[in-house]
Amino acid sequence: MAGYRKLGRPTDQRKAMLRNLVTSFLKHGKIETTETRAKETRSIAEKMITLAKRGDLHARRQVLSFVTEEAVVQRLFEEIAPKYAERNGGYTRIYKVGPRRGDGAEVVILELV
């Protein structure tokens, strides 16, 4: 059994999509996407927040290797991480919205708690 979801894409496209989803999620605090993408994004975003809570230079560089925008990394370390200083994991929440009109895929909202 695989440790991650393939999301029907080649590796490079999947990584690029997840980087963009995580960056958008941390930038806006919530995103609307399909359920499987949200679950995969949630996993990575929680790791990024945990790294940001550490707050040192190495953690910042590790986050920068994945998140595509410097401003988002700044926001993550200065606003988001301090907010969750006392919380051990579980920084995100997934709400089901319903099926998407075009193809019936289950759409959810992924947001910060």
From Swiss-Prot:
One example GO MF annotation: structural constituent of ribosome
Record's keyword terms, sorted: Ribonucleoprotein, Ribosomal protein
InterPro entries associated with the record: Ribosomal_bL17 (IPR000456), Ribosomal_bL17_CS (IPR047859), Ribosomal_bL17_sf (IPR036373)
Biological process terms in GO annotation: translation
Pfam families according to UniProt: Ribosomal_L17
GO cellular component: cytosolic large ribosomal subunit
Family note: Belongs to the bacterial ribosomal protein bL17 family.
Subunit structure: Part of the 50S ribosomal subunit. Contacts protein L32.
Name under which the protein is recorded: Large ribosomal subunit protein bL17
